[in-house]
Amino acid sequence: MVDNRPLTIALVAGETSGDILGAGLIRALKAREPNARFVGVAGPLMQAEGCEAWYEMEELAVMGIVEVLGRLRRLLHIRADLTGRFTDLKPDVFVGIDAPDFNITLEGNLKKQGIKTIHYVSPSVWAWRQKRVFKIGRSTDMVLAFLPFEKAFYDRFNVPCRFIGHTMADAMPLDPDKNAARDSLGIPHDAHCLALLPGSRGAEVEMLSADFLRTAQILRQTYPDLEVVVPLVNAKRREQFERIKAAVAPDLHIHLLDGKGREAMVASDAALLASGTAALECMLAKCPMVVGYRMKPFTFWLAKRLVKTDYVSLPNLLAGRELVKELLQDECQPQALADALLPLLADGKTRHQMHDTFRELHQQIRCNADEQAADAVMELAQ
């Protein structure tokens, strides 16, 4: 730290998830250094914790190639301006929170100026575009990783990495209250319950909803009392799902939910979901699951060649085996999905073993991530 100056931390967050992480980190650092100064690109939560925003986070929150190209000049201007201002400020540590396409280059620029840099949240370099690890190694003094297999990957390339656990694992209880979740959703305690989560993106909902609904129809033949809950992320996805349901399964009774994905998982005996963060959340909710995923044929062909992992879902990557059934592309058919879900809806050995393994994995990644991240920042700042 610079003599006679309070701890000064520069941060850049590019989206809502990064704002949540940044706010938790700032809170943990303020508990140790009450006079610390925080500056950079911040969302409302980070600003509420006292971070001085040189730019609003929304400036960086662009998705899709067309949108990025339309904003490229502005994004490059912001990065160049931040490089200059942070170089003049000489913060004790710079923390780039996610947003790797923006932050890793910025981290490299600052590291060349002698500023300590941290990249918080590993990009999926272990899964695809693995050569990015070399740029990350040149650009950062430390990567903070949510998952243990991410640290193992960086260790192979001698890139400093600290496994800090996952903030979602900290936020969710080890033993969720299933009956309370059912009460809040109006689901009888003694009914069988299935959650359908066909994804958050329009393309996913379009590709998966029909087969997910047909799967529920098949399962209801075995379990006539089956309650089906379908949480959707926003009004647009709900409207899209309702249109597909009207064409495919107009008579299937379901509970459509606005948001409430976590409650639906906790309340359910089993879930059928697209992969992604939802699979991790479902594991932490202790809800046995099957992953079903389909994409356009060329995209799948390309993904098979680019992706370097044996599994697509985080529970399987954490377990190092096929704990959760993954039915991808041509295998993602209603009968196959139903066959995989049947033993999970039955109150038997398969379901209980999966539940117990989920609990063990939860404990592995429940490490108080905010405090661990603050430890890493303080160690670099010395």
Swiss-Prot record:
Gene3D superfamilies from the UniProt entry: Glycogen Phosphorylase B
Pfam families in the cross-refs: LpxB (PF02684)
Pathway named in the protein's UniProt entry: Glycolipid biosynthesis; lipid IV(A) biosynthesis; lipid IV(A) from (3R)-3-hydroxytetradecanoyl-[acyl-carrier-protein] and UDP-N-acetyl-alpha-D-glucosamine: step 5/6
Any GO CC annotation of this UniProt entry: membrane
Biological process, per Gene Ontology: lipid A biosynthetic process
Domain of life: Bacteria
E.C. number: 2.4.1.182
Family label: Belongs to the LpxB family.
Name of this protein: Lipid-A-disaccharide synthase
Record organism: Enterobacter sp. (strain 638)
Record lineage: Bacteria, Pseudomonadati, Pseudomonadota, Gammaproteobacteria, Enterobacterales
